[in-house]
Amino acid sequence: MANIQLAGRAKLTPFRHIALGTWRTAYDPSIYGSLTVPMDDTLRYIEAFRAATGARLTVTHLMAKVMGAVLAGVPEVNAVLRLGRVYLRRDIAVFFQVAIEDPETGSVDLSGVRVERPHERDLVDLVREFEKSTSRVRRREDLEGLEKSRRGLLRVPGVLIGWTMRMLSLLNYGLNLDLSWAGIPRDPFGGAMVTNIGSLGLEGAFVPLVPFSRVPIIIATGAVEDAARVEDGQVVVRKVMRLFATFDHRIIDGAHAAKMVKIVKGCFADPFASFGEPKALPIATNA
């Protein structure tokens, strides 16, 4: 079985072909952009959802739905670069970075969880899966997945870790080999990454692409904050959140970004329509 399920090779435009030859790695083709989205209605939606279901919905869960919709709505960006060519993915999955604390040193580390087809998932189920998965990662109980492979890499000497990561990326993505037999999870990062820098108290920051993951999109969500807005000629205070995007220009360009922005704006413009009206969970009764 292959490492990732591919739908076939993408047909390249002249620019895309030139871009593949211009940038050799994910270190230099990064392009950046930010978007401010309104949050007043979204915060009301989160409050209503929590009241109706009891599930602790957060902005991160909604971003899972949004990014799933982005990958589904702009399939050209749901792609992976391998052997100098762009291949489209069959599956839709989003990776969320999770901050964890090393129990021995107390230092902060990064791991994460992968969510499949989040745009099609029921929000309550999505929240529960997040809570379960992130809890396992933070307790370092994910010994069959990404956390296990991360621990294994600690045995690699520092002088060889760069070469090792490049080799694993080549085998996993370049040659599309399933290395699960060696403890490397299949396609652990999906087609996009999201990291919540707002939880760290940051209003915003651009984060780098992760070269060995071959993921062409990483979104950083900033803190929800008050901002002055002009509405009907009057200055009003509204809740907003900024999204900071880093793209791999070998796969994504401005035309793709415009389509993605339209989807993101649509989701946050009317969250009750985009994410579904909150409904109380049915109460189980004994027959």
Report each predicted region and the residues it spans.
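C-terminal catalytic/motor cores of large multi-domain enzyme assemblies
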Residues: 1-287
